[in-house]
Amino acid sequence: MIKGLLLDFYGTVVEDDDTIMQAIADQVAADAATSVSRGHVMDAWTREYEAVAAGPQFRTLRHCAMRSLATVMAEVGCAGDPATLCAAQFRYWQSPPMRPGTREFLSQVTVPICVVSDVDRADLDTAMAHHGLAFAAVVTSEDVRAYKPDRAMFARALAALDLGADEVLHVGDSMSADVYGAHASGIPAVWINHRGQALPSGTPVAAEITDLTGLIELIA
């Protein structure tokens, strides 16, 4: 019996920042000294971000975003201030649009929810206030000083709800951070596949849904 839920936030409860990141990548590609595509900038930015986030010293998400973008800008010869370019992304984190189905789901769910999000606490608090959202518990990467898939994130969430791994589902859109992160902690994972991707063979998912309304029957 499911007694609680762990929910990713960006890409699960609210829309992810893909569009904003693509716009930033477009600007970097347009201003680069060499001919590069948006896709090249996006791939490089993602790679550098993951390297910074996985480093030995914890960095806030805002720092990770700016530091990794600065590295990519230097690589392609793009002059400018990464903080200025990232400003739109930071604003987005504080007022993202709600994902389809979220309001309907939240109006029907009865089990306690802990949000588990790779984001700075102030940005998440502002985003939740923007939409008038409240949950039983909230765990951010800044609170734990670690990012998913680190087990510490999931352990903190379970402790916050006072539930065991076999009593909850973790729900998120990231295969690496959410699905494999939860699986490594012994928590069944539900994948939010809002991009219409093919589920890789052997992926440890308890269920695949497109939005949170798909959870209603799963936890009934």
Task: Give the positions of each predicted feature.
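N-terminal helical cap/lid subdomain that shapes the substrate entry/recognition surface
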Residues: I2-R103, D120-A122
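Asp-based, Mg2+/Mn2+-dependent phosphohydrolase catalytic module
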Residues: M1-L5, G80, R103, S107, ...
